[in-house]
């Protein structure tokens, strides 16, 4: 089990980091090719990307958990129906997003806080991302299913190749073809299509557990997928809401340049969070498998190992970011704006304290989801993503940018305390 655990988490971390580089690559190339206004537009549009990404995770993690549990009892017909219902739900949601993007992108951009200076770039990013929603949803969903179907290597390969192609296409479209913001977002949208083409190879594998079959619609299957996957979607949605809230507060304090600085800090934060998502998602198939077979010993071992690794990774990442904050900021500050430079460095040093607790919270949330305790998982996500961060950021914003940066670590610390209490209660019940 330990060897499988190491294999799964290593591959999953690589894959999740690759996905996080979608936006990081955009951030870097937009900073170099378009400038501060482009960074601001990108950060204003990120909440929508989080929402779309979250829906894909909900479908993938929800159906993946069901797949892992159903495999224990060799219920292949039910597994195929879970897959078919996942495709149906993804298609319906994807089409709705496409229509919304085509018709309402300008209104949505205004709602997200875009002013006249950045409106056109924000609309371009939003409209293009939303038109390609089905690709993002199916890529995330199929990736999680393939990983749960004992093929983590293919899932990771798809993510890494797609991410590398995104970087290459970003460079080509922005610097060689001079396509501006559209070039950046178009490169990002082509990446999941590349990922899907690689993931489709799983259907040629003899040991593949799920296949497309004739759909026998059952609302209960959709309900179960959503219930199990909802905590994963909630993580992404809450992340997007935090970005939206911070953007709104920062615009009032320091204007567009403050949002650009937050965009730099936020995108590096998201890459680091992707490491913990990878750690947790690597644990998930094995935890669900142990839960399905009532193997309490393995459940405890997996939880302890994952939490220990989370704390070790947090220490390494924080030390690296703290000592290299100046260099990291310079990579995204082509115009050498002193305000952006100062704000971003301050943000790195304060906000990243929360990384120690964020890692623990992500692991605990995924653990509870894996053992079908979705209510506890959702409670933790709502605490760190809405209930605590919203009042904390609004109140602490009275102290300027230092207050904004401090609100996130505070929320993560309190959530960790609540998560530990839930864990002890769960152990006492069992």
Regions found by a protein language model. Name each.
Residues 1-13, 67-132, 176-230, 287-353, ...:
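Short alpha-helical transmembrane segments in multi-pass integral membrane proteins
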Residues 1-34, 47-62, 66, 91-98, ...:
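N-terminal transmembrane alpha-helices
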Residues 7-26, 128, 139, 162, ...:
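Transmembrane helical elements of multi-pass membrane transporters/channels
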Residues 21-40, 109-116, 172-179, 240-267, ...:
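Helix-terminus/linker motif at the lipid-water interface of multi-pass membrane proteins
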Residues 27, 101, 144, 170, ...:
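Structural signal for membrane-spanning alpha-helices in multi-pass inner-membrane proteins
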Residues 60, 128-147, 155-166, 184-199, ...:
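Short runs within selected transmembrane alpha-helices of multi-pass transporters and secretion channels
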